[in-house]
UniProtKB/Swiss-Prot annotation:
Domain of life: Eukaryota
Record-given protein name: Photosystem I assembly protein Ycf4
Species of origin: Tetradesmus obliquus (Green alga)
Main location (coarse class): plastid
Subcellular location: Plastid, Chloroplast thylakoid membrane
Length: 205
């Protein structure tokens, strides 16, 4: 018999999903746009205030980009207060959110694998967590601890489809990823394969 008949390993993507890469990039670019707009409105307002209080504006030769900002403000650009200030505020929030999101992607929080090993008679559930004491979540159980495989399907706006590993002592361990639920067909297929592989009952379907 080949290795597949003794060992099954299911990989969990975690935070490194395409949708997370997409939204983290969009928010980062958008926040930069807000910040640049707010900063440019502040520079333009400062230049205008300086020009009004100084009689030597005509004798000054401003750098090209500063003069462009001044001219844009005089032709209908936003004022720093309150519009520009709000732009800076929302841009800063968006930037911090995108940095946090990129950190989650870099750490791959929630990613890992489930290994079912008949050859050595153990089940291993591995997940990456946040940096610190619980960075690695590595759980081991024996195959004898498994009583059944249970599938939970919650319909609605935030639909959830989860496979649970039911252990002795009424313990249940979720073994599917969070944030990107599998389709009903994928859940049924994976749960059935796992129940047949472990030779335990399947509940919830």
């Amino acid at each position: 018999m080949n290795q597949e008949n003794f060992i099954r390993r299911y990989f969990i993507i975690g935070e490194r999903r395409f949708s997370n890469y997409w939204w983290a990039t969009v928010i980062l670019i958008g926040s930069f746009g807000f910040l640049l707009t707010g900063i440019s409105s502040y520079i333009s307002t400062s230049l205008n205030s300086t020009a009004l209080s100084s009689n030597i504006e005509s004798q000054m030769q401003l750098p090209f980009f500063l003069s462009m900002l001044k001219n844009s403000n005089s032709t209908g650009a936003i004022n720093f207060f309150p519009q520009g200030l709000l732009m800076c505020f929302y841009g800063s929030l968006g930037f911090l959110l995108s940095i946090y999101w990129w950190c989650l992607i870099f750490w791959n929080v929630g990613g890992g694998f489930n290994e079912f090993n008949k050859k050595e008679n153990f089940i291993r559930i591995f997940r990456w967590g946040y940096p610190g004491k619980n960075r690695k979540i590595d759980l081991y159980y024996t195959l004898k601890d498994v009583e059944s495989i249970r599938v939970e399907i919650l319909q609605g706006f935030d639909s959830q489809r989860t496979i649970f590993l039911k252990l002795k002592g009424n313990r249940e361990i979720p073994i599917t990823g969070i944030g990107q639920p599998l389709t009903l067909q994928e859940i049924e297929k994976q749960a059935s394969e796992l129940a047949n592989f472990l030779q335990v009952s399947l509940e919830g379907l």
